[in-house]
Structures are given as C-alpha cells and as structure tokens.
Amino acid sequence: MKIAIGSRPYDGPWGGGNRFVTALCDALGKAGHRVVHSLSDSDIDIILIVDPRMRSPNVTFGPGGIMRYLTWKNPNAIVVHRINECDERKNQAFINDKLVRANLIADVTVFVGDWMKDLPVWQRHLREPHFVIHNGADTKIFNRQNFRPWGGQEPLKLVTHHWGYHPMKGLDVYEAIGRMIGRDVWKNRLQMTYVGNLPGGMSLDGIRHIAPLNGVALATELASHHAYVTGSINEPGGNHQNEGALCGLPLLYRNSGCLPEYCEGFGVAFEGPNDVEAGLGRLMRDYSQLVARMPLYPWTANRMTSEWLSLFERLHKDRKAMRTRRNLWRHPLKALIKQISF
C-alpha cells in the first residue's frame, strides 16, 4: 500500500504527535508499505489526517487538498482521520469546530481514547465507522533497563515531562508539589524534576527544571527517578504517561481526560492540587506492589502500530464498499469552506 500521512516527522523533542508519526512511518516501512507526505501521486491507497491545521509547521496537506485530490485525481483513496485534540484540553472554543469540519472528508475516524470519542461534540457529529487506538511509546527507548526502584529510605524522586507549556498541562498540581517540598514534613522525603517547557518567566519553586529532552536522553532522565506524576487536565491521550510507565515508574495521575484509561491499575489517581498529597501517600504505601505490575503496562508503540496496520489492511480490502458510502458533497457549503486553509 501507499499511505499519505499529512504530517512530517521531526527529529528532536516535538511532542507526542510527532512520536506517533515517527513510529507509524517506521512500522509501515518495515511492513513493506510506502509512506509519502504529499498528495502528488495518483495511486495513494490511504490518506491519514493527523492534524488538519495547515498553519502547523509539520502539516503537509489539509482537508481542502484531500477534497481536491479525491474529486480530480484519485477517488479510490480511503481517508482516515486520527483525532487526538479537543477544545477541552486547553479550554478553547475553535479546535472542535475545525475537527468536525475536517472530519466531513473522512471515511473512517480513529480516536486515541474512549474519553475523546464520548465528548459531546462527537456524540452529535460522529459517523460510522469509528475506532479507538490508544497511543503507545517505543520500548526500544523507553524501558526499565536503567530503572532503580525506590528503597523507602531515601527521598522519593518524582518526574514529569511536557513539550507544551499550557497551564492545563498540570501546573497547578506541580506548584502544589513544590509547596509540599518546601514544608518540613516533606523536605527530606520528596524531590521532583520537571522536564520540558514552561510559560515565559515562570519557575516552579522547589522543583528542578531542565529543558526538553528527546529519545534516549529523555528515557535516561525518566529512569533516574522513582515515580511519574501527571497533572494534565482533559488530556486527550498523551504519550508522556506511557513513556514514564514503560521506564518502570509507577504513575501518580490526575483523574481527568484519557489518563484513567491509560493509567488505571498502574498507579494512583488524584483529583487535583488539593488531594495530590494524599495520592502521593497512597503511592508510597503501595509502591512495591505497583512496581511489580509495571512490566505489564500495555501501551507500547508496537501494539499501537500493529493496530494501525491491521486497520489500514482491512480498509484497503474493503475500499470498494467504503467508496459507495462516501458522499463528499452532502454538505455543499461546508465542502466549499474546506478549500480555505484551516
């Protein structure tokens, strides 16, 4: 098969979406398929929308280009839309609308978590067929090789990492942990590292902050800690918790967004800054049992890409039937609006 992916992978710390594209391109190539990042060829079998926003620097084509491609060059291609973003993630009011408009061109929709699929916007607009394929991290990089569990006597070392610097990434929780570290009861029992970007001029008191890392350097840093914390609000299905967990670190995670479906059984949930201290106490109490479970953590890149390849193969096999269900012009005005860059 020839698969056109509308996002080009970048080297370096670029966030979870970039890691997804990198892993999928690698898996497709190893399976003997050809990956392109444009719509120049007339024999594309599958078109994958990763991000419909043409203003993003790594996006190579958008819904308007796909519409023209299907209409004038190759109506046989099947369009798959991967959805890993939402208004709720950053308390915005325009992402969902862009995704819904882009989704009109899609034959198939894939969400990165059940929480995403169940959002009100998709309960109103979602069409069959749709699937959920969870994100996964690369175990060749993120693994337990260098992990040393907490012994219970030394300070417990927490870590988190984020490419994006929006406050809803959990800064309220990390600030609360910083205040905890400043109290006598925790001063010699707890340390924390934040890897990644922060809003301009912001610092996290009591917390070690280092610049974004990628690949082996990131995995090495994560594995030098004892537990992973994520305070992300309405997380649509990030990869950061996967990378920490696959390095062997039990998870202290916010009960929000997709995090519970990724983290349940492999850590301790909390609601926010007011109860993160209690959650940390439970994690410390149950640490040995949680560490023993971490080798069973399921969300790997191998699992994720296997599910994607299986889906592509089924779609390619059923492409004639899928084409008969397609109606690109069922909403003429919205179809014309697609010709304007998102």
Annotated model-derived regions:
Residues 36, 40-105, 115:
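Extended catalytic core of nucleotide-activated donor transferases of GT-like folds
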Residues 92-93, 136-154:
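Acidic anion/phosphate-binding donor-loop and adjacent secondary structure
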Residues 93, 104-130, 137-141:
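A short, active-site helix/loop in glycosyltransferases that binds the activated sugar's phosphate group
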Residues 148-169, 175-179:
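Conserved donor-binding/catalytic core segment of Leloir-type glycosyltransferases
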Residues 233:
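Aromatic "clamp/platform" in nucleotide-sugar-dependent glycosyltransferases that forms part
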Residues 250-253:
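Short hydrophobic beta-strand element within catalytic cores of glycosyltransferases
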Residues 285-338:
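A charged, aromatic-enriched C-terminal amphipathic alpha-helix characteristic of glycosyltransferases
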